[in-house]
């Protein structure tokens, strides 16, 4: 995933093979931002994600949080990149996360329709002050009314696994969405543009509209060539 987003050739220690996406088009830039106490070698993409994979012991462990954010056609690419970097630094890195982000502008892949966006991959484990990886979860033991640990049928203390950070919570995700919306709209206002975005759904905005479905590059290419698709027809019906 990291190689694809960055358009690079990376070697996986776990799989013992290279992932080569150096021929992938549309990758404008990619960066890794670190919190102050993170080892500087994590600025190397292969080192970072191989280390993340090595620290996990369970073969099905989730390695990273990953999400995409749309950039704005009303802004220049330089402005979009600066805005993306500011968001990643302020909302993610300043909270202790290592963040790997890449800006894409795959015009040709999307049938000529500008679709700038950026991908973000962040670490799930916090980094301790000494630069080592912290725990994803901690044990919170179940206590009785007298403060003693409750035992299960096998005589072992019962506990709940509690996340050590709030990074994966719905509330945090909402904060990120709201922060991005605010940053973009502030930029629009500063440039004197009469346009705004809203991170809320139509339902939350009180708007009686049906959202369009995501078409993707293949559908957009077909539509650009005059080939009508089911998703294209549905979106035309929604917009009518």
Where are these regions (language model features)?
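N-terminal nicking endonuclease/strand-transfer module with a His-rich metal-binding environment
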Residues: 1-240
């Amino acid at each position: 995933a990291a190689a694809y987003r960055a358009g690079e050739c990376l070697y996986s220690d776990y799989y013992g093979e290279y992932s080569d996406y150096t021929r992938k088009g549309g990758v404008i830039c990619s960066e890794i931002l670190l919190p102050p106490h993170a080892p500087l070698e994590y600025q190397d993409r292969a080192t970072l994600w191989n280390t993340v994979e090595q620290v996990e012991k369970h073969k099905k462990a989730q390695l990273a949080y990953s999400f995409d954010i749309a950039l704005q056609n009303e802004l220049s690419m330089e402005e979009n990149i600066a805005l993306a970097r500011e968001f990643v630094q302020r909302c993610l890195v300043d909270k202790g996360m290592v963040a790997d982000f890449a800006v894409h502008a795959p015009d040709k892949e999307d049938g000529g329709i500008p679709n700038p966006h950026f991908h973000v991959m962040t670490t799930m484990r916090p980094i301790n002050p000494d630069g080592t990886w912290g725990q994803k979860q901690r044990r919170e033991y179940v206590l009785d009314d007298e403060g003693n640990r409750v035992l299960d049928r096998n005589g072992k203390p019962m506990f709940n696994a509690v996340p050590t950070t709030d990074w994966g919570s719905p509330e945090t995700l909402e904060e990120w969405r709201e922060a991005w919306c605010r940053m973009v709209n502030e930029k629009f206002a500063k440039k004197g543009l009469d346009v705004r975005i809203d991170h809320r759904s139509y339902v939350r905005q009180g708007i009686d509209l049906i959202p369009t479905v995501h078409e993707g590059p293949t559908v957009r290419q077909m539509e650009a060539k005059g080939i009508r698709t089911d998703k294209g027809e549905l979106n035309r019906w929604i917009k009518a």
